[in-house]
Amino acid sequence: WYHDRLYNFGFDEAAGNFQNDNFGKGGSAEDPVLAECQDGSGTDNSNFSTPPDGTSGRMQMFIFDFPTPNRDGSLDATIVLHELTHGTSNRLIGDGNGLIWDEGGGMGEGWSDFYALSLLNSSNAFPPTAEYVAGAYATYQFAGLTDNYLYGIRRFPYSTDNSVNPLTWADVDDITLN
């Protein structure tokens, strides 16, 4: 589903998409995404390693072990789509090597959240002022919190309503920017 939607947006063979057979349409073939569910090499996170076109991307989704019972990150659609979008943006910018600095990583996080949340929302389901939460299932009651289903993996849900998400540029920590 994600592959087909992004293909329609232009992430096709020539752009470096992830697929086994490129059907002679450009790019390098034999590079499907290797999705590892319940990967045992970590907890409470997920990631996507993006090599250049022609080599499979590796998506690892871990168990979130702070909620009780544990929750599987691969069952949270926002996490899966978020990680797949890291693969997309990393392939499109520098063929796997373009978003390696702090600013690029920050942009990648934002794009990945945006695509995950927008692909799961129909155009008229909710207004921009609604609350859009990334990682709500996997992080529910994470570390003893009882209301983080409203926040997920971010400090506030995404929204254009300042009473829902009050963050502005003034909230950026200038120490981390130096």
Where are these regions (language model features)?
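Extracellular zinc-dependent metalloprotease catalytic-domain scaffold
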Residues: W1-N178
